[in-house]
Every structure is written in C-alpha cells, then in structure tokens.
Amino acid sequence: MLLAVATRERAACLGRHVGAILVADQRIIATGYNGTPTGFPNCDEGGCHRCANPESYAEGRGYDVCICVHAEQNALLQAAKIGYSVQGSHCYSTLRPCFGCLKELYQAGVTAIRYLNEWAPSDPIEAQAYDALLGELAGRGVVVAPLELPEGLLDLR
C-alpha cells in the first residue's frame, strides 16, 4: 500500500489523487494513478473539462465525461502494455474503487481488492447497484475490503 500512496503523488487531478498497484506472487506487476490519457494535457493544465469547470457539475456527477483514467484502470492498462497477466493478482488502491473499476478488475482476473480510504456513490440508486455488485463479487470469492494499517504507522490517508 505504501507504493500506491507514493504513486498517487504523480496524479495531476484537481480533485482526488489516487494510486493503485497490482501484485502477483508477492511482486509488483503494475502501478497506476488517476490522470488524463498519455499525451493529453493534465487536469491542472486544463485537460479535463470536468476538473476545469467543477461549478458546472453537481457533486458526484459528470464522471462519465471526465477524461481521466482511474488509477486502477491505469494499472490494468500498464500491465497489458507490458504483457503481464493479472489473473489471480491483488489490487491495492488508496481509494475504494468505483463501480466501473470494480467490474474491470474482476473481468481482468483480480481476486482481491484492498483499499485505504472509503468511497461510496452519493446517489441512493447508484449505491444500491454498487452494493449489489459487491455482493456478486463476494459470491464469486473476490475480496473487496479496507486494508488495516499496522498500529503506529504514519497516517497515510
């Protein structure tokens, strides 16, 4: 998780900074942080309309038009670019993954997802769908749970 925390520092998003790593056989196979696609201007350079115009979007809205690639997505894509299978791997993220990232992690074969900070949909209907997805994943043996940090470790949240 410490590497995911360090990785999130690369994010240039005007909102949250999120980092994620994929681990297989106790080896880090990919890292990712949230940000614009390769070659696009970063959020802090005006690359994302949603980040540049937050007043235009209600809280929790507009993510479908956000240009940014989520940290978990970037980690999956980096593993694919270099030819690493993520089947059976674990994901460590600084934020509880969104609905889309949970689906993608499952589809890619990730079997455990640990996160540092809580996140949940603010819309009640979306929250129901999210909880249903968590139930489906649990029924398929996929662990989605917060990571308990050892006592005395610097607060990294």
Which ranges hold each PLM region?
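Zinc-dependent deaminase catalytic domain
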Residues: 1-157
